[in-house]
Amino acid sequence: MASTADIKNGVVLNMDGQLWTVIEFQHVKPGKGGAFVRTKVKNVMSGKVVDRTFNAGAKIETETVDRRDFQYLYADGENFVFMDTSDYDQITLSAAQVGDAKNFMLENQDVTVALHNGEGLYVELPASVVLTITYTEPGLQGDRSTGGTKPATVETGHQIQVPLFLEQGTRVKVDTRTGDYLGRVTD
């Protein structure tokens, strides 16, 4: 048993017999009344996100999660197949378990998979990835100095907002947590 002081982003909690991972947390000490911890947790199996509040000092049940290196192999319908890079075992995760990470994963990309009792829970990506723009509207001559953006489709099929001067075939760095354009990559 742990207490609410142990709550951090990424901690896996066992609530009502289900595993939930902490997405956001905030310790609140109001001027009147006792302190509490406000959290946003995500069900690791269904992907459902809910707000949950705990009284400060309350006992919570945490679960040990093993994070191991895997390689993303391919998508099979609504499932995603990964290979453990140490022993070459393959596991399959559902689209709900993979979540928004599917928008930034390329085949043969190295990822981290969180495991609990040998079963895959969710995928963790690096903070940013490099992707190639596969489609975007061409920029106009006067667009280069303004700060506007336009939609662009990257090689995973996901659409992001990029500056007007970027063209098809350009490699860009994308934040995997927010989906924001971070910069152009030059080789």
From Swiss-Prot:
InterPro entries: Elong-fact-P_C (IPR015365), NA-bd_OB-fold (IPR012340), Rib_uL2_dom2 (IPR014722), Transl_elong_fac_P/YeiP (IPR020599), Transl_elong_KOW-like (IPR013185), Transl_elong_P/YeiP_cen (IPR001059), Transl_elong_P/YeiP_CS (IPR013852), Transl_elongation_fac_P (IPR011768). GO terms for molecular function: translation elongation factor activity. GO terms for biological process: peptide biosynthetic process. GO terms for cellular component: cytoplasm. The keyword Cell membrane does not apply. PROSITE patterns: EFP (PS01275). Keywords: Cytoplasm, Elongation factor, Protein biosynthesis. Its main location: cytoplasm. Pathway: Protein biosynthesis; polypeptide chain elongation. It is found in: Cytoplasm. Involved in peptide bond synthesis. Stimulates efficient translation and peptide-bond synthesis on native or reconstituted 70S ribosomes in vitro. Probably functions indirectly by altering the affinity of the ribosome for aminoacyl-tRNA, thus increasing their reactivity as acceptors for peptidyl transferase. Belongs to the elongation factor P family. NCBIfam families: efp (TIGR00038), PRK00529.1 (NF001810). This is Elongation factor P. It comes from Clavibacter michiganensis subsp. michiganensis (strain NCPPB 382).
